[in-house]
Every structure is written in C-alpha cells, then in structure tokens.
Amino acid sequence: MSSQSLYKVSGNIAANALVNNDQYKTMYQESIVNPEGFWREHGKRIDWIKPYTKIKKTTFDDHNLSINWFYDGTLNASANCLDRHLAAHSDRVAIIWEGDNANEQRKITYGELHTQVCKFANALRSQGVRRGDIVTIYMPMVPEAAVAMLACARIGAVHSVVFGGFSPDSIASRVIDGKSKIVITSDEGMRGGRAIPLKRNIDDALKHPDVTSVEKVIVLKRTGGKIDWVEGRDVWWHSLVETASEHCAVEEMGAEDPLFLLYTSGSTGNPKGVLHTTGGYMVYASMTHEYVFDYKPGEIYWCTADVGWITGHSYMVYGPLANGATVLIHEGVPNHPSPARLGEMIDRHKVNILYTAPTLIRALMAEGKQHFDKYNGSSLRIMGSVGEPINPEAWRWYHEVIGHEHCPIVDTWWQTETGGILITPLPGATDTKPGSATRPFFGVQPALVDNMGNILEGATEGNLVLLDSWPGQMRTVYGDHERFVLTYFKTFRGMYFTGDGARRDEDGYYWITGRVDDVINVSGHRLGTAEVESALVSHELVAEAAVVGYPHDIKGQGIYAYVTLTRGTEESEELRQELRQWVRKEIGALATPDLIQWATGLPKTRSGKIMRRFLRKIAANEVTNLGDASTLADPAVIETLIETRLNRNE
C-alpha cells in the first residue's frame, strides 16, 4: 500500500540534530543493556537538592510490583522549571500567550513567571494548602493555569487538573476521589468565540452531596462575566496575590513523592486517578521534549494540547519549561475564527516546532488547503502528532500543506499512564513512514505478544506490551493500587499491557492499530479499525471516518463505518458503493464495510478523541442505555446518529 512510502532524513537535518541514526542505535543499545548506567548519567539533566545514588528498583511481577526511580534523591519540580534558569536567562520569554481573540497577547519572561509562581504559592499557603494536599485546577488556557500547577509543585501540593470542557458531574467525581480542600478556577474561559461558564460548573459540581472536602474556591478574573459568589468560600485570585510575598522557598520533595494526579476515564466505572511522581517524571518529560523535538535554545515551541490533558502537562508545562524553552499557549482553537488561524499563528509568532493532533489536521484537511494560501511557514522546523494514530493521508497533507515538505514529522505514541513519549521517530535519526510511530525512545522496551502472552518475533501483529520500566511511568491509581495492578500487569504476567494493538514491520517499525477493543474479528480474521478508517479517509471525498464492529449473523462481526464527507459533497447510494469498492481495493475484500452511515459529526471528547463505545452501541442497535455522554464536545451528535442508524431491528 502507498503507506509504505519512506521519507528519508535529510542530510542537513541529520548533521545539525542532537541525535543521528548511529548515535540513536548506540544510545538505545546502552539504555537497554545497562539501564542503571544510562539513567545515572541522564538523570543529571535536572537539578537535584540531594543527588541520587540509587537509580532503579523496578519489577513488573504482579505479586510484588515495584516502580522506583532515583529514589533516594530529592528535588523540586518548580525549581527545575524556573529557578535554575534565572541566573543566565531570567529575561528569556517563557510563555507567549495568545487569547481566543488574537488581539489579546502577553509575553512572560522566566523572571516574571518565577515571581508570579512564588506569589501564588504563598497565596495557596495562606489558604491552608500544605505538602501532600490535593488541589483541583479547572482553568482556561491562560498562563495562570501553568502558574497554579507550578505553585502547587513549589510547596509540595499535588495538583489535579480537570479539563475545562468537563461537566459538573465529571468535576465532582474527581474532587470527591481526591478529597480536595482547594479548587482553583476562573470566572469564564473563552473558546471559539464562546464564553465557557467555568465558575458556574464548579458551583454546580460542589453542590453534589458527596463533595464535603472543599473549603475554598480561588477565582481568576478572566472575562469579568457575571458569576455567583459564595461568601466565606470564594476568594479572588488577584486579591490573594496582591498581598503575597514574591519570595517562596521550595519544598524539598523525594523523587518518589507525588507531583500530580490526572484522571482518565476508564471505559466503564469511576475515573482513574493516574499518579505521577516527581523525579523520574521530570527527567523523562524534559529528556523526551529535548530529543524528540530536537529542541534548540531560543526556539519557539507550540503544543496545541489543552493543559487538562497529559500532553499539556508534559509537553506544554514541565518538559519545555525544565528545558528553558519558549512556549506558545493559545486559549482558543486553532481553526477559529477560520481554518487559517493555525498558519497565521505559526507566522505571527515565528513558531519553530508544532505539536498537534490528527483530529485537528483532519478538520483542516476537510476545509481545504486554500486556507493556507497566505501562509508562509518558513519558521517551522519540526512537526509532531499526538493523541491517536495518524492516518497516512492526513500525515501527507500535514507534511505538504503545513510543513511545505521540509519538516520532519514525529508521530508520537504514548499514554497518560506513561508520562512521556515512548515510541517516536527522532528528527535527525529516523526515516519515517506515514502512519508509523517507528521506533522506541531510549530505555523503552516494547514487545508484541499473542493472547496467551507469548512474545512474537519479527514482522508480526499482536498486543503491545512493555517489558521493563522507564522513569516517566505512573506509579499507581490513586487510592486503588489493586486496580493499577489488575489493569496493567495481570493480563500478561511480568509485562505492562498498554491496551493497544500494534504491528511491527520488516524494518522493526511499530504501527499502532488502535485499542485492542477496536479490533474487529471478521470471519475469524483480525482487522484493526484504524486500517479501515485510513483507507476510507484516503478517498478524496471523505473528511473523517470511524469504524466499529457490530454483531453479524454470518461473519460473527460485520464492519460498520460512520463517514463524514468533505464540505459540499452530496450523500448518495452511488458514493456509498464507491467507498465500499475503494476499501476493497485498498485493503482487500475482507475489509469491505457492510454498512456505511453518513455522519455530519462524530461523538468526540473535547480533546478530539472519538468515543467509539457510543458508536459500537449505536451500530449494535443498543440505543437505550448509552451511558454517560457528559464528556462529549457535542452530545447532540449522538441523537442524530441514533436517528439515522442503519442496523435497526425491523
């Protein structure tokens, strides 16, 4: 298939990159053969208060699970992001902020950010926050979100950031689980020209009968919009920092002390509080940021993720700031007020490195490349993709239209649980194939196993596992260690199970095929839904596609495709048949969709992930009990899909 095309590393990039292919091979080999020695050296990239002497105490044995890194050292994450840059770079810009409205812009130097963080850390202390307390942060994409995180880290409090698009119920469940005393929010946020009622959502969440721990709500004035006020509980951010000292000594934290909680929704049941600790996480986030993006001092780096996701934590706050980078933070969405916004911002801020998601790339692709006619893009050097496998068609569009065919693309695979990037190309070292995450980062040992846990060699397909620990790995599910062991280490003994399927090609490159529950078994043959989706999207009239299995009398499972057409394309039975033939030609008869439903929109979370469990239920005609839809960007999409579903029981 065309996805096998190879994009070679240019000589110019290889010559100037931090790591070329020979260096990658040498360093990778050392990291696997001698992890103690490798990480002893690379752990020094951050500042330690008490240097570590013990590097690694890890085992994936589910009866005796242990994940410890640099575990006798002490440090502070906030000091690593701020204080250590002050002597040489206090005037360097740390954050460039652009509001939802492009007329609103701010620049904050490392010196200024340090002052703001110290003042807010003292403000938190004045409200009774102590080391080990969990602080819930529900903020828009403004610099103060990073200030709040770093202030917590400075005084040893554990932050739990909740994405600003989540509903009151979602907020409540996270506050209850973490027993937060303090919630930090904003009157409103701005996104795509609309005001988002953050404070109102917090008020509603805190009315939940099981929320009993919250004592104070700190409110940032962002829009000046009208809000309700609870005397004695609510306090303005600005009134607290006005009187706070700008000197705040850092709390000395053990490497294995918690840095943050980040909740991920399990496919069922309560959200999982993924717990990351301080030392290993800071080493891994900063190292992956530098090497994966080939970051050079002074470059402008833009990660479009929201601070409420792990990508925002690792690659907008902790990784880049630990490296002294200049980070662009954007409050709104990069395709508002028009699809040209992304290109305008790259040009306006002379962005050198862009890290974004396939869902945005596909959305821009559907609008057409004419929106980039005025885009210059000459500042751009490296481009990344994160969040889900990127289909080859979108990869090539990204490469041609945004990267003008001269920027390497790093298609990164990792998870909330992994803390940082695990499988990725390196710009100066890895020839890329559209759709492949390519090779493991240093210290990462992926393997493919069959359903019995037997390791598969060579070019093959199977369940993606990791054989040994890496410093950025999560340590537990907050308050439920048994769930942690059960979810990740019981399925395949002695291995971390990612929940993803993958194939490895003859070059040793990894291709993520999607969640293992996104595999369709058609007449005894396993088909990754991502593969069928890629084939559909490679048709010029298809903007987006989501594929699920549904019960089929003859095949066991049939293939059900939800297809969004490009703007202006008419739905027709002829086009439906054309798409079925197209997939047949691209993959084979086995992959031909049985049912194709036209979909004006797909059920997505606000980070752009397609919620396939809804699609599976609709395809199976199980439409009475779909479960919680509160995390969807547009819950109305579900109603439309139910009304137009094809698999009704007549």
From Swiss-Prot:
It catalyses: acetate + ATP + CoA = acetyl-CoA + AMP + diphosphate. GO terms for molecular function: acetate-CoA ligase activity; AMP binding; ATP binding; metal ion binding. It comes from Shewanella oneidensis (strain ATCC 700550 / JCM 31522 / CIP 106686 / LMG 19005 / NCIMB 14063 / MR-1). Its EC number is 6.2.1.1. One of its GO terms (cellular component) is cytosol. Mg(2+) binds at V537, H539, V542. This is Acetyl-coenzyme A synthetase. Acetylated. Deacetylation by the SIR2-homolog deacetylase activates the enzyme. Belongs to the ATP-dependent AMP-binding enzyme family. Signal peptide: none annotated. The lineage of its organism: Bacteria, Pseudomonadati, Pseudomonadota, Gammaproteobacteria, Alteromonadales. Catalyzes the conversion of acetate into acetyl-CoA (AcCoA), an essential intermediate at the junction of anabolic and catabolic pathways. AcsA undergoes a two-step reaction. In the first half reaction, AcsA combines acetate with ATP to form acetyl-adenylate (AcAMP) intermediate. In the second half reaction, it can then transfer the acetyl group from AcAMP to the sulfhydryl group of CoA, forming the product AcCoA.
